[in-house]
Amino acid sequence: MEYKALIEDAAKAHALPPGLVEAVVGVESGGNPWAFRYEPQYYERHVAPDASTRAVAPCSRDSERQALATSWGLMQVMGATARSLGFQGAFLNALCDPAMGLEYGCRLLARLRDRYKAQGGWPGVVAAYNAGSPRKAADGRFVNQSYVDNVARMLGGVWPQ
């Protein structure tokens, strides 16, 4: 993968397995740092109801609200998530910078590891990365099992310890 050294550095900084970070990058963006995706359902559920969204100069309030509901960069970090993790830049598209996107993606992955790994292992952490929490359906599979399976495939079917 083109950004292997940056992936290894970001993973190491957050005590994450580099192979896992590389697998998430592969599934999320296919290694394209300029990948972005507006997620209207996220906007409707999490951004639109929050009247407190402030504009980050020189960005308009409306632009900021749209950017919060967009996933950015190699790890497809949601703008709102990046802000909650301390991103202060005026424009959330800065997350398309490979090092910046990896930093915030790994911050999130490390936070989810600390919260969910003991109960769900890496599959639970990965499910939470994609869906916010490792929710399971009535059949005992993750609600986003196909995402978890895609990451597992990128890992060659072997989860890190």
Regions found by a protein language model. Give the residues of each.
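Catalytic glycan-binding domains that act on GlcNAc-containing polysaccharides
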Residues: 1-161
